[in-house]
Design a protein with these regions (language model features):
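Conserved inter-motif catalytic segment of the P-loop NTP-binding fold
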Residues: 99-132, 139-140, 288-303
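Active-site phosphate-binding and catalytic loops of NTP-dependent enzymes
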Residues: 30-33, 73, 96, 110-115, ...
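Walker B catalytic acidic pair
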Residues: 153, 159-161, 171
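Walker A/P-loop
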Residues: 72-113, 178
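Conserved alpha-helical scaffold flanking the Walker A/P-loop in AAA+ ATPase domains
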Residues: 62, 117-123, 134-156, 189
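Peripheral, non-AAA+ core regions of ATP-driven protein-machinery
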Residues: 1-72, 76-79, 184
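Basic, amphipathic alpha-helical bundle interface domains used for macromolecular binding and assembly
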Residues: 143, 166-304
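The Walker A (P-loop) glycine that initiates the GxxxxGKT/S ATP-binding motif of P-loop NTPases
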Residues: 75, 138, 160
Length: 304
């Protein structure tokens, strides 16, 4: 793991003779280097190029990644909501050195760190809707970090959001606002970091096909109204982008569009957007549109 630590040159030695050689003739000792950008090797397994017929959804992901915005996607089953969400880390900037250390410490405290491992890629966490409150926000006998802290500096994907108990979703209010979560345990309280991009996904109704042009919805108006009120207003107020994700057509599924944006294309747009924000907010305590206070919008942004 030492070769990942900045300002330290690490050498490997199989025998004591290798160590003696290093001490006597260090210039002759070969240093093995490791490609620091290990994100690409991991993220290349999934790519936005695989997502067909969802250019609007991809555009929303670019905006979310560039401005650090929370997103809610609404669409029927099979429309591609999960594919859009799970590829978001592929277009986020690499973790800085400080972020790598912080993320590694979090996973170490949670007991999820493998031996001699330094986490170098953005976390992606996708808890199931049956997850307990303690597993989401943290807690238990040892006050371990929960999913929202394990997603720190990465992505928290809440799939089938209306299926989560309302009190579990409402527990996201504090971290979405302050990027921290306080876990109370007996006589002590613990503050854990929870700075992530939150992606909520939901069907438009219990059966999943309200408004779908290809399949008729069978939900009653009462069921529909009850379903649409499962997510509280304070949570929705903290979501920046809302998009409707329609099921791609049969032709979209068959034809691989050469003009469809790949993760590499989208990452370039994200990097350009983040650079523009750094220049715009160079003298401000915040550095992204997602952190922009309401009172500063008219002053710092041209919205005419």
């Amino acid at each position: 793991m030492l070769h990942n630590i900045e300002a330290i040159t690490s050498y490997g030695a199989h025998t004591l003779a290798d160590i003696v050689k290093l001490v006597i003739r260090p210039d002759e000792y070969r240093v093995d280097t490791v490609d620091d950008d290990c994100n690409d090797a991991v993220n290349s397994l999934i790519d936005y190029k695989d997502v067909q017929g969802q250019e609007l959804g991809k555009r929303a992901m670019v905006i979310a990644a560039a401005g650090v915005h929370h997103v809610m996607m609404i669409g029927p089953p099979g429309s591609g909501k999960t594919m859009l969400a799970e590829r978001l880390p592929t277009i986020l900037p690499p973790l800085s050195w400080e972020e790598r250390l912080e993320t590694t410490r979090i996973h170490d405290v949670a007991g999820l760190l493998e031996k001699n491992t330094l986490i170098a890629k953005r976390p992606f966490r996708c808890p199931h809707h049956t997850a307990t409150l303690a597993s989401i926000i943290g807690g238990g006998s040892n006050a371990k970090p929960g999913e929202i802290t394990l997603a720190h500096k990465g992505v928290l994907f809440i799939d089938e959001a209306p299926e989560f108990p309302r009190y579990v979703l409402d527990a996201l209010r504090q971290p979405l606002e302050s990027h921290m979560i306080t876990v109370n345990r007996l006589q002590n309280s613990y503050d854990y970091p929870a700075d992530f991009i939150c992606i909520l996904a939901a069907n438009p109704c219990p059966c999943g096909y309200y408004g779908d042009p290809h399949k008729e919805c069978v939900c009653s108006s009462t069921e529909l109204e009850r379903y649409q009120h499962k997510i509280s207003g304070p949570i929705l107020d903290r979501i920046d982008l809302f998009i409707l994700v329609e099921r791609p057509s049969f032709n979209d599924m068959l034809c691989m569009d050469s003009d469809s944006m790949s993760s590499a294309d989208m990452k370039q747009l994200v990097e350009k957007g983040r650079q523009m924000q750094l220049e715009r907010f160079h003298d401000q305590p915040f550095k992204s549109n997602g952190a922009l206070p309401h009172g500063a919008i008219r002053e710092l942004c041209n919205i005419r």
